């Protein structure tokens, strides 16, 4: 396809009709050429989801109470309210254990049928072995990551069912070695989310992506695929517990005005701020997330899990 030059850029129209397209730009005078891969996700734009990090306390509550339904747990009941009202799909990243003596092995499978019946709007995935230490997988190798991810996935399948699993997760602290990410990928997680903070931020939260170019690309465009490792990285849009309630809508409005950053909206919040016993409890936790979800719906975003819109096809 011949390109035209506008004094600054060479441009040419091309049609994307498949997931992966290799594009080659060639100088017909010198023979010099450059190639790149383009990925087309036709259903990616205009979608949103809720994602929850650091989850373990609600699971301990389920284990310690004789509830007739998982939705007698106030935490899960709130997310069901959002589903019932807006159709919101919620992705929950969980720990294997808490900071005391509880592990998810103590969960009964008595609610398994109910988990499965709600799998059209709920997901459970591996987050980490536990909340502490911070940055637990910063230097972890393949075997350490595999040990923890396999343990959590096995428990999810046991007490909730494989229907709740999927190829997407957010790793605790979002820092890992390439070997650790290979273990995640081999366990089934080939779509990874994080903050991907731009330099010179001291906490990249960017898995093994250490170059400024990769981090800036993800910060500005919200998606990048490592073709060598067969892993797709996606940036979350907002961490709601870090914002005042009145700041949420203006922040999301700003994102939506940028077509590169506002295509898919991941509304992230952490579990602990929901619970009154937590020292940094946020009484308006529900209001924050209802505000964020209502904004998404009123701005035309539809609920979707990432495996429905970002997986290879």
Indicate where each model-derived feature is located.
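Aromatic sugar-binding surface patches on proteins
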Residues: 4-10
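Conserved structural position at the C-terminal beta-strand
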Residues: 25-27
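Surface-exposed, short loops/turns at beta-strand junctions within beta-sandwich domains
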Residues: 13-20
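C-terminal domain-boundary segment and adjacent tail
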Residues: 192-196, 264-313
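Metal-dependent polysaccharide deacetylase catalytic core of the NodB/CE4 family, i.e.
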Residues: 89-177, 200-204, 269-275
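Acidic (Asp/Glu)-rich catalytic clusters
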Residues: 77-88, 101-127, 185, 221-227, ...
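Active-site-adjacent pocket scaffolds in enzyme catalytic domains
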Residues: 101-104, 163-164, 173-266
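Active-site beta->alpha N-cap acidic-glycine motif
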Residues: 35-118, 165-167, 267
